[in-house]
Amino acid sequence: MKRGCFFLIMSFAILQLAGCIFFSTSISFSEEIFWNKVDEGLFVGEFDSPLKSKINDSKVTIVKINPKFYSFRLLCASEHSRARITAKKWCEKHNLIAAINAGMYQADGIKNVGFMRNFSHLNNPRLNDSYKAILAFNPVDPAVPEIQIIDLRCQDFEKLRLKYHTLIQNIRMISCRQENVWSQQDKIWSMAVFGMDKNGDALFIFTEAPYSGHDFINILLSLPISILNAMYLEGGPEASLYFSLKGVEFEKVGIHKTGFEEGPYNAAAWPIPNVIGIIKKPR
């Protein structure tokens, strides 16, 4: 091979490699532009839904939490004076940075619909056969992830339940295979959702704009958030998310109406019996 041709080929190869490196770097950093860093390991993002709702602004609000820097807390009215209070009040009373519904509750206004245990306290001792996701945190065993959504169709819960102090059972939305497991429905509503991403970060997810569960799962799978799996927490006016840290404060509340009228619907936050909250770990 002539020397001139050799240098031409090598130059072209180097340019291609540089282009690949640049492209890969662009991909790896592309998600960061959607997140506002509030503190180390703590981000807030507001995403435009690709599916527009006829009610409200079609925004999806997400708090991303790195469990390396934050601890998770389950607070239950059954363990704290049996008093239901708003997510904001739960935060103020227990020094939480953020709080979201821990799940749907029964007619008594206190007990979770699915199994719920927090250390020695049992809010609901019975597993719900219809609910296939269990949020687990406060590990007993340092070998397991600090927080995870256990998929009852994919994982051995009987072994894993012994490895965590806190367990919260709810409805599975995104499976361990990243599949939408909800069928389509006509009903639409606001939603609070808990997710985990592929980096092991926890996601507090909220949409005030109402969607069917099936459609909202597809929205989450389409967003640039690297979502791994997700479980349903609450819907309608009971759905709540509160956040306050370093001058960033917001309170998200589900709306009462689920029709197709245009216009904003500003609802007051409902008192709720059970929340998942976060606090910063000591250095």
Enumerate the predicted regions with their spans:
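Hydrophobic membrane-insertion alpha-helices, especially the h-region
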Residues: 11-16
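Zymogen propeptides
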Residues: 26-128, 205
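Solvent-exposed coil/turn segments that connect beta secondary-structure elements
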Residues: 68, 104, 199, 279-281
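Short, surface-exposed beta-strand/loop "edge" segments at domain boundaries and coil↔beta transitions
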Residues: 54, 69-72, 82-83, 142-145, ...
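N-terminal Sec-pathway targeting helices
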Residues: 2-9
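Active-site beta-strand/loop microenvironment that shapes enzyme catalytic pockets
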Residues: 94-95, 121-279
